[in-house]
């Protein structure tokens, strides 16, 4: 989030080359498919293992079924036995990408577009951040997801 005020000499406009103020931290976690957004959740802090496990059990697993594949990077919390077990219990299969391979992960493109969308609107409060996220979700359409999967070398037909 952006700082709402700044200091300067009287009669002079405040100017800064680089933002040095860090606002409140927000973390967004989600899952996508070629058909669109599967689930998404915003957290007002850093992601912790228990937050991810809760997301998987309450948001992701109810939408999984036999034959689905959950593609994740090699983040430690993604590879926990509890998360793997929750996913396999639904009949889905967890699949882990090689290290340092965001080019094969379509959700990285979603995060990139979301970050630029947030930078453009510059929300200054948590409420404004939630509103920007809601608007972003309304703007997304199925063609975005299909193109992101195609760009990551997944079969889209």
How would you describe each model-predicted region?
Residues 1-17, 83-98, 117:
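A short alpha/beta connector and helix-capping loop motif
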Residues 1-57:
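Extended, low-complexity cationic-aromatic segments
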Residues 33, 64-65, 141:
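Short conserved AdoMet
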Residues 33-37, 76-78, 100-103, 154:
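Short, solvent-exposed loop/turn segments at secondary-structure junctions
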Residues 51-69:
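Short, basic/hydrophobic alpha-helical segments
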Residues 56-59, 87, 134, 139:
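A generic "structured core" feature
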Residues 72-74, 81, 95-119, 127:
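RNase H-like two-metal-ion nuclease catalytic core shared by retroviral integrases
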Residues 107-157:
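C-terminal anion-handling pockets and recognition modules
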């Amino acid at each position: 989030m952006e700082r709402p005020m700044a200091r300067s000499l009287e009669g002079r406009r405040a100017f800064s080359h680089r933002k040095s103020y860090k606002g409140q931290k927000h973390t967004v976690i989600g899952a996508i498919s070629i058909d669109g957004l599967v689930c998404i959740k915003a957290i007002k802090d850093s992601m912790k293992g228990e937050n991810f496990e809760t997301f998987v059990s309450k948001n992701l697993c109810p939408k999984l079924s036999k034959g689905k594949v959950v593609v994740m990077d090699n983040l430690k919390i993604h590879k926990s036995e509890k998360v793997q077990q929750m996913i396999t219990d639904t009949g889905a299969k967890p699949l882990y990408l090689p290290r340092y391979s965001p080019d094969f992960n379509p959700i990285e493109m979603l995060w990139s577009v979301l970050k630029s969308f947030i930078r453009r609107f510059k929300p200054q409060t948590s409420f404004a951040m939630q509103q920007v996220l809601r608007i972003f979700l309304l703007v997304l359409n199925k063609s975005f997801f299909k193109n992101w999967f195609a760009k990551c070398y997944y079969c889209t037909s």
